[in-house]
A protein has these predicted regions:
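N-terminal secretory signal peptides that target proteins for export/translocation
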Residues: 1-10
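C-terminal soluble interaction/assembly domains
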Residues: 244-315
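Solvent-exposed, acidic/flexible segments
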Residues: 39, 43, 57-65, 92-103, ...
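Short alpha-helical scaffolding segments that buttress acidic/His motifs in well-ordered protein cores
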Residues: 64-72, 125-128
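Bacterial N-terminal signal peptides
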Residues: 14-25
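Short alpha-helix capping/helix-loop boundary micro-motifs
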Residues: 225-234, 250-251
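Acidic/His-rich structured neighborhood in mature extracellular/periplasmic domains
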Residues: 75-223, 239, 248, 266-270, ...
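Sec/Tat signal peptide C-region and signal peptidase I cleavage site
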Residues: 28-32
Length: 315
């Protein structure tokens, strides 16, 4: 049985364990004075809160802690964000403060920590979510191992620090990613925010959607990871605000190798996981308690790949 906190991804009408492609009251001093939540705030109040965070917390690591804390309690919804009203296959909004999944939680924390301005952070978000910042379904960073992580490293938003933490105990996971099979399994049930089509129009749109993957060759994904067995030794050396990508054993029936994305946050000297928990909300859990959930999983958790969010010049 899969751990309850592992996100699932829908492939056609089937439901497979896959990418979720990240806490209780915070004890950090900054949390005491920044006790609000974005959830339920009107846009003007969100904009004001972001400006205040930017003014009060010039250090990026502090901003990551505070911005991510403002998402605590936000409900989990699978795939809450899309390409907006002009999207061809997914017309969900391009930014959301009312619902998040694990990847969109990490993305919005990144964007609004790097640029604590509502308009500026929203623009930056699209550069994080999409290859080269080009907004379309096919350029969205769908797969962490071959899209999200390498594209954001190339764009200069993150750097891999796995080897800095695990040293010579670092291991490498590999998997063949088939985007063509992933696209070929698309069905009308996966279309978001699109209505009023005749059956023929819907069939044509789904056929076009499936065709996006027809010419995409399979890709060999390779990710370094901190083995789960050494986490107790190294968890306290992971910098607060680090992105952790959960790396799973290769399973041919599952299209991904990264099943979840979350943040590692220091709270009073103890490492916590801050995550958008599947079918729940954004929350905190003690890190080692969280990772113990995966013991005995039928889809083994090999370890975690770690990425540091990098400051951006001019922001």
């Amino acid at each position: 049985m899969m751990p309850a906190r592992c996100k699932i991804i829908r492939i056609g009408r089937a439901v497979l364990p896959a990418l979720c492609l990240i806490m209780s009251a915070c004890t950090l001093p900054v949390r005491a004075q920044d006790s609000s939540s974005f959830y339920g705030m009107p846009p003007q109040d969100i904009a004001q809160a972001l400006r205040r965070i930017g003014n009060d917390h010039p250090n990026l690591q502090d901003r990551i802690e505070v911005v991510s804390s403002y998402f605590l309690g936000t409900p989990y919804v699978l795939g809450p964000m899309g390409e907006g009203p002009q999207g061809e296959f997914d017309r969900n909004p391009i930014v959301s403060f009312s619902a998040l999944d694990c990847t969109t939680f990490v993305e919005e924390t990144m964007a609004f920590s790097l640029d604590p301005d509502l308009a500026g952070g929203t623009a930056l978000l699209q550069k994080i979510r999409y290859k080269d910042g080009v907004i379309s379904y096919q350029t969205r960073n769908h797969f962490p191992s071959v899209d999200w992580i390498p594209n954001n490293i190339k764009a200069g938003f993150i750097k891999d620090i796995t080897r800095e933490i695990a040293g010579n105990q670092t291991r490498i996971a590999t998997k063949t990613i088939s985007k063509s099979a992933w696209y070929a399994a698309k069905t009308a049930a996966g279309l978001e925010g699109i209505s009023g089509l005749s059956p023929a129009q819907e069939d044509a749109l789904v056929s076009k959607w499936r065709s996006l993957g027809a010419s995409i060759p399979d890709q060999k994904a390779s990710l370094p990871y901190v083995p789960i067995g050494i986490l107790p030794e190294v968890i306290d050396s992971i910098p607060s605000g680090t992105i952790a990508n959960l790396v799973r054993a290769d399973n041919p029936s599952i299209p991904v190798m990264v099943s979840h994305q979350l943040l590692i946050i220091d709270k009073g000297g103890q490492a916590y996981v801050r995550e958008a928990a599947y079918n729940d909300k954004v929350e905190d859990l003690p890190a080692m308690k969280y990772f113990s959930i995966y013991q005995g999983s039928k889809w083994p958790l090999l370890g975690i790949n770690l990425d540091e969010i990098l400051p951006q010049s001019g922001l």
